Amino acid sequence: DRLIHLREVEKLNFSFIIQVDTLCHRLPNFIAKCARAGVKKVFIGLENINPDNLLAAKKRQNKITEYRTMLLAWQKAGVLTYAGYITGFPGDTAESIIRDVEIIKKELPIDVLEFFYLTPLPGSEDHQKMFRAGAWMDPDLNKYDLYHVTAGHPKMSREEWDFAYREAWRRYYSFEHCETIMRRAAALRAFGNTLFAVSWFKGCIEIEDVHPIEGGLLRIKDRLSRRPTMPMEPAWRFYPRYFAEVVSKTARWVWLYGRLRRIYLRIKHDPKRYEYTDLAITPVADDEAETHQMFQTDSGQAFLDRQRRLERARKDGGGDKPEPMVAAE
């Protein structure tokens, strides 16, 4: 309320990004107030759409039956949705990761999705367990950035996991799906920074080969900044190669942004842009969960069964007692 006062009464112009959990939309007026307070982007800890993987991540509060309702609530408030998705849970395979990405593209209206490797970060519980079990972990701490494979997987080889991870990025940020993202945003009147966001994420992966949270418009390299074990590259070789790299990447960035901007302008000037609809931006019906691909797995059906039992128990108990919630992680 104080932030709203500063913006609407004191006329201070500011905006920010917040991080929330997947049940924040249940808090009365929370999303509407966030939008008025200046929230332009919201990071949502989606983590996964597989119920077993969510339990492994200790995300019991994440209810996949409510993902779309929550995402639509943010988008209708004009806030760009930004979610993280972890690959490499024990039950994952290359095929299941790719399948889940295709389901997300079809059924969830996420603007920006970033992918991570499941990583045993030093100091975490996972790292401690793996260390005590004597499991292999990459000794190079520079790779613990969630963008490199740093541990083994029970069902995938390192090559399979890496392929699935790269394929997830490629499929989600295909030009076809980038257009779908922008069409959804236009239909919901939430265009905002969608063009910049999809350009940034697609370009960082395909041009710079760095995670978007570590990316930038110009990659600065210092010839003298080398690991002690690596030889120093001579100036006559380093600077011409660096210059050529900058020119090449800049040209690719310009081409990429230009192509996406043409898509953006075509949608923006389409008189029927507000009429666009698909499954992801269709309001959720009470009985539609069973028809979604998201639930056409053993774990998905088991999750639905548990939810039905809990709902019956609440009704039999004489009321709808809400589950404990927190508004931000």
Q: Language-model features: where?
A:
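Alpha-helical membrane-targeting segments
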Residues: 176-273, 278
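A structural motif corresponding to the C-terminal lobe/cap of the Radical SAM core domain
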Residues: 5-195, 215-218, 271-329
